């Protein structure tokens, strides 16, 4: 009996020391970005400035790191899988995503959950695969080993990615957003950010500022509120400089009217925040489409016939500054074939 207790004690000590060592290592190697960082812009050849007289098409799409297509579920959404796509499936999803972008033919593409070097996507550089003419990537998840759940997520290097077709990006910045998580959970968690890309405008010293965002998903709600407040302060500051601002991405908050269109029948799994029209300053506006859901719950593989368990949301869209005219906005129904989100395409013109 004493030998058994001694063995259990030694085993417990080993487990405690291993856990302490892991937490120490994660703390030392934690991704700690500065409040504002310059982001490298890669470009191919001579590119154009934005023509203020021409219509501009902008696409926002959370691509789910090309690992969350129609056949996927996810443990954080009430599903079972941690990694539901093998390498061939990731490549197939990526090919489908690229094909859809080429078909939609936007001028500016703002993507979320784009992996650079992650175990879950077999170290494929998705940004390089999807890049058009000028591109910038801002990291929001950088961890050599994410120890949860079981099996663990492992290595993740991922973020938001903006790429343009034929248009120049003069510079880009990563703006850190408040992190709602405390130590030690924070050490292996997402560090949300804005990616602001500055596109020059013909005949002007002002910029079109394309702000790519992916706000908090799995917090108590306070994180989303703080991040939305900071987003609002940033875009209003850019507008005050005379710039034109389009903020787009995955807000993880339901756009006005979205809850009535797609009631949340699974609040025990996930309750997204709510965006209110009156949160915007005078002249600013949302651009979103309620006719097509922009996201599905990953509690199971996609089955639109299962109306009881299939949950939809409209949490992806845009915010436009008063000097940007909204011409149209369309949720593009791709049946969640290659991602758990559908893309949203807006057409605008500078005033």
Residue ranges and their predicted role:
Residues 122, 137-162, 187, 222, ...:
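Active site of divalent-metal-dependent phosphoester/diester hydrolases
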Residues 57-63, 93-123, 197, 207-213, ...:
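Active-site beta-strand/loop signature of hydrolases that rely on acidic residues for catalysis
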Residues 80-87, 114-116, 177-186, 213-222:
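Surface-exposed cleft-lining segments at the edges of enzyme active sites
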Residues 87-94, 224, 228, 308:
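A conditional alpha-helix N-cap/helix-loop micro-motif detector
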Residues 47-58, 67-70, 156, 163-170, ...:
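Beta-strand-turn-beta hairpins that frame and shape the catalytic cleft
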Residues 145-148, 175-182, 215-217, 332-337:
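Short, solvent-exposed aromatic-acidic interface loops
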Residues 61-64, 112-114, 142-145, 164-166, ...:
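Active-site-proximal beta-strand/loop segments in catalytic clefts of secreted hydrolases
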Residues 3-133, 141-152, 351:
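N-terminal, active-site-proximal structural segment of metallo-dependent hydrolase catalytic domains
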């Amino acid at each position: 009996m004493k030998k058994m207790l001694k063995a259990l004690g030694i085993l417990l000590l080993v487990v405690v020391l291993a856990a302490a060592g892991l937490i120490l290592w994660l703390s030392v190697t934690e991704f700690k970005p500065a409040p504002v960082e310059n982001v490298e812009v890669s470009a191919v050849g001579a590119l154009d400035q934005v023509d203020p007289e021409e219509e501009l098409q902008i696409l926002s799409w959370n691509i789910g790191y090309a690992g969350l297509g129609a056949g996927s579920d996810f443990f954080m959404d009430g599903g079972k899988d941690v990694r539901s796509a093998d390498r061939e499936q990731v490549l197939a999803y990526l090919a489908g995503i690229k094909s859809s972008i080429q078909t939609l033919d936007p001028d500016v593409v703002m993507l979320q959950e784009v992996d650079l070097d992650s175990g879950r996507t077999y170290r494929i550089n998705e940004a390089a695969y999807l890049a058009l003419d000028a591109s910038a990537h801002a990291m929001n998840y950088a961890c050599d080993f994410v120890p949860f759940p079981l099996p663990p997520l492992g290595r993740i290097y991922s973020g938001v990615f903006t790429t343009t077709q034929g248009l120049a990006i003069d510079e880009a910045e990563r703006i850190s957003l408040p992190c709602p998580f405390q130590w030690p959970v924070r050490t292996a968690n997402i560090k949300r950010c804005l990616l602001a890309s500055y596109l020059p405008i013909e005949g002007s010293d002002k910029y079109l500022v394309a702000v790519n965002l992916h706000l908090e998903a799995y917090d108590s709600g306070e994180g989303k509120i703080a991040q939305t407040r900071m987003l609002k302060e940033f875009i209003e500051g850019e507008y005050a400089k005379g710039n034109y601002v389009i903020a787009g991405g995955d807000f993880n908050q339901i756009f006005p009217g979205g809850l009535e269109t797609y009631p949340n029948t699974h609040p025990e799994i996930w309750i997204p925040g709510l965006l209110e029209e009156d949160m915007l300053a005078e002249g600013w506006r949302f651009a979103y489409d309620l006719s097509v859901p922009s996201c599905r719950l990953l509690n199971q593989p996609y089955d639109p016939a299962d109306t009881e368990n299939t949950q939809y949301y409209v949490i992806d869209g845009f915010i436009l500054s008063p000097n940007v005219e909204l011409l149209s906005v369309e949720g593009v129904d791709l049946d969640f074939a290659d991602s758990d989100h559908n893309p949203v395409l807006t057409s605008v013109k500078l005033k």
